[in-house]
Structures are given as structure tokens and as C-alpha cells.
UniProtKB/Swiss-Prot annotation:
InterPro entries, alphabetized: Aldolase_TIM, Elp3/MiaA/NifB-like_rSAM, Lipoyl_synth, rSAM
Similarity remark: Belongs to the radical SAM superfamily. Lipoyl synthase family.
Enzyme class: transferase
Positions that bind [4Fe-4S] cluster 2: C103, C107, C110
Pathways per UniProt: Protein modification; protein lipoylation via endogenous pathway; protein N(6)-(lipoyl)lysine from octanoyl-[acyl-carrier-protein]: step 2/2
Phylogenetic lineage: Bacteria, Pseudomonadati, Pseudomonadota, Gammaproteobacteria, Pasteurellales
Segments crossing the lipid bilayer: none
Signal peptide: none
Cited SMART domains: Elp3
HAMAP family: Lipoyl_synth
Residues where [4Fe-4S] cluster 1 binds: C77, C82, C88, S317
Protein name (record): Lipoyl synthase
């Protein structure tokens, strides 16, 4: 087949997905052909500022992984191939990914597996709480795959997880990084009202012009509405959102999205560089230099964001505890 930009790609035959099987890379993008991905494309060379020095001691990393495995839990750090895994695990922090490791969406920027997920584990909220207790965490981030197969899109499971963590760890602060609860926004917020988090996070990811390409199945206005409705219900709880750059957007478009976030009551922001997980994902169109991230941070301050973490390796949950305290993260 030929893509919209005229490059030839290998046609992959459609197949029937099996429940509980993780589909990644070519298998993931062949479920519905992603026309703007060419696995034979020439990749941009990483600049010096994008190179990571790995730690020599992995004891802390192994300890975090063991704690996850022991309770049958998942971290988005591993499932999404986050470049900060070694730094965060060595710092003693991890972001728990609940509701399994199989997503019902197939966003071509994301390395989380796609497929037909298994039923929810009703004991998972308690397992997360016990792991938080074992690891003596004072700040924890809970995120999830998209679960469009669930009537409430997983809102009750989020609420149960917050409740169990608080019950076992009353001093622990909980940030939730939620999906868009497609078509169930008001229902989801009503459910979360029973056990609200300390920080509410939902990522817009990029600019509306590129949404069909980057976030198939999502809607820019829905995501803004979710952030707005939550803030209206919980005016004293910080709301947060994250953006990736380097996917073909302009700086002016990113600044416009930042203003949209402020107009919808969002008080915390993260902006980081998109990194291509494999040749079967969206290509990095450019590496944004550190000076431009500093510009985003400066403009965010002018717009009235209470905290903005902007830098090449910044991710939503990167040093989330420090972000919540208002400390500089970049």
C-alpha cells in the first residue's frame, strides 16, 4: 500500500484479536491500518541533550520491579517504555497502571499494548494499597489503560483504588492520571466524588489539528470538558494536564492549547519531548531544544499556571511529588 505522504508500506493482513493477548508494534497498528506510519522511514538522530546515562547500580530498580510482580501489578513506566524508568525507580517512585496492561485504544504514539482486555481484578485496589504500604510511599500516581469495554470506563475502579490506598496509607497523597471516560464524563466524575484524589490529571497530549492522527478515538473538546467538569466539582483540588512535542505541531499551537487548559481551570502543566517507541509508531518530526522548553515554562507562568514542568524528559508523573510541592522540575 501507499501512505498519504506517498511512501510505500507493507500491507498487513487483518486478524481476529484474542482476549487477553497483548498486541504491540506492527500487530497493534495493523488492527486498523495507520496510514502515516512507515517502518522503513529514516529516523532523526538524537541530539546530545536527549542521551541518557544509565545508573550503574540496579538494586533499587530490581526492588521496585519485584514489589510490582509480587502483587501481579503493572507500572506504566515499564508498559509504556518510559525513558525515565531508571531515574524514577532509583528515586523510589513508580506510577501504577491499573485495570490490566491491555488498552482498548491503539494510539500510534504509545507503547502500551492494544487488544481485548481481561475482566477487572476486584482485588487489585487492595493489592495496590498494600504495595504502596510495603514501599512506604508518601506520594503515588495511579493511571490506567483505556477501558472502553466497561460501562463506567473504569471510574469505579479508580475510586476503589484511591479509597484502599487512603485506608492503609492515610498520609499518602494520591494523584490519578485518568483516561477520557469517553461518553461517561459526568458519571465518572460523580463516582470519583466518593473518593477524590489529591491531584486530578488528564493529558491532552497534543494539538487539536493532529488529534485524528495521534489520538484515534479521542476528542480534544471532550478532554477539555472532563478537566472543566472535575474542577467545577472540586475547586480546591489541583487539575493537571500534559503535552508531548515533536509530532509536527508548532510552538504557537502548543501555546494555544496551554491557554485552552487555563481557560478550563487547569493549574498544573507538563510538557515533554515525544520519543518514538519503535519503527511501527509515529515518527519524531523534530527534537525540541531545551531553550524552547524554558520558553513554554515561562509562558505558562504568565498564563497563570501554578506549576509547569517543561523539559525534554518531562512526563506527566515525572517527579510528580516535587511537581505537587511546586518545586522546579525539568
Amino acid at each position: 500500500m501507499t501512505t498519504a505522504i506517498g511512501k510505500k508500506t507493507t500491507k498487513l493482513e487483518p486478524f481476529k484479536m484474542e482476549r487477553g493477548v497483548k498486541y504491540r508494534d506492527a500487530a497493534k497498528t495493523s488492527v486498523i491500518q495507520v496510514r502515516n506510519i512507515d517502518p522503513d522511514q529514516e529516523l532523526l538522530k538524537k541530539p546530545e541533550w536527549m542521551k541518557i546515562k544509565l545508573p550503574t547500580n540496579s538494586a533499587k530498580i530490581d526492588s521496585i520491579k519485584y514489589g510490582m510482580r509480587r502483587h501481579g501489578l503493572h507500572s506504566v513506566c515499564e508498559e509504556a517504555s518510559c525513558p525515565n524508568l531508571h531515574e524514577c525507580f532509583n528515586h523510589g517512585t513508580a506510577t501504577f497502571m491499573i485495570m490490566g496492561a491491555i488498552c482498548t485504544r491503539r494510539c500510534p504514539f504509545c507503547d502500551v499494548a492494544h487488544g481485548k482486555p481481561l475482566p477487572l481484578d476486584p482485588y487489585e485496589p487492595r493489592k495496590v494499597a498494600e504495595t504502596v504500604q510495603d514501599m512506604k510511599l508518601k506520594y503515588v500516581v495511579i493511571t490506567s489503560v483505556d477501558r472502553d469495554d466497561l460501562a463506567d470506563r473504569g471510574a469505579a475502579h479508580f475510586a476503589a483504588t484511591v479509597r484502599e490506598i487512603k485506608a492503609l496509607n492515610p498520609e499518602c497523597k494520591v494523584e490519578i492520571l485518568v483516561p477520557d471516560f469517553r461518553g461517561r464524563v459526568e458519571q465518572a466524575v460523580a463516582i470519583l466524588k466518593q473518593n477524590p484524589p489529591d491531584v486530578f490529571n488528564h493529558n491532552l497530549e497534543n494539538v487539536p489539528r493532529l488529534y485524528r492522527e495521534i489520538r484515534p478515538g479521542a476528542d480534544y473538546k471532550w478532554s477539555l470538558e472532563l478537566l472543566k467538569i472535575f474542577k467545577q466539582e472540586f475547586p480546591n483540588i489541583p487539575t493537571k494536564s500534559g503535552l508531548m512535542v515533536g509530532l509536527g505541531e508548532t510552538n504557537e499551537e502548543i501555546l494555544a492549547v496551554m491557554q485552552d487548559l487555563r481557560d478550563h481551570g487547569v493549574t498544573m502543566l507538563t510538557v515533554g519531548q515525544y520519543l518514538q517507541p519503535s519503527r511501527h509508531h509515529l515518527r519524531v518530526e523534530r527534537y525540541v531544544p531545551p531553550a524552547e522548553f524554558e520558553m513554554f515554562r515561562s509562558e505558562a507562568e504568565k498564563m497563570g499556571f501554578e506549576h509547569a514542568a517543561c523539559g525534554p524528559f518531562v512526563r506527566s508523573s515525572y517527579h510528580a511529588d516535587l511537581q505537587a510541592k511546586g518545586e522546579l522540575v525539568k
